[in-house]
């Protein structure tokens, strides 16, 4: 889990817009965050398996 200080730092508006980065809304993870959902790959997978994301299905081919 992300430290509270880092979550707060990412939540504020940076002095320069290139310094802004996305964090997972659930766990605060800074890497591999899907912008469309606002979730990291791990939380996205867990929520999709539980059926909490409407329209998201496991791919099969």
Swiss-Prot record:
UniProt GO BP: translation
Alphabetical list of PROSITE patterns matching this protein: RIBOSOMAL_S14
The entry's keywords: Metal-binding, Ribonucleoprotein, Ribosomal protein, RNA-binding, rRNA-binding, Zinc
Cofactor(s) it depends on: Zn(2+)
UniProt-annotated binding residues for Zn(2+): 24, 27, 40, 43
SUPFAM superfamilies (alphabetical): Glucocorticoid receptor-like (DNA-binding domain)
Example of a GO MF term: zinc ion binding
UniProt remark on cofactor binding: Binds 1 zinc ion per subunit.
GO cellular component: cytoplasm; small ribosomal subunit
Family affiliation: Belongs to the universal ribosomal protein uS14 family. Zinc-binding uS14 subfamily.
Function field: Binds 16S rRNA, required for the assembly of 30S particles and may also be responsible for determining the conformation of the 16S rRNA at the A site.
Assembly and interaction partners: Part of the 30S ribosomal subunit. Contacts proteins S3 and S10.
Protein name in UniProt: Small ribosomal subunit protein uS14
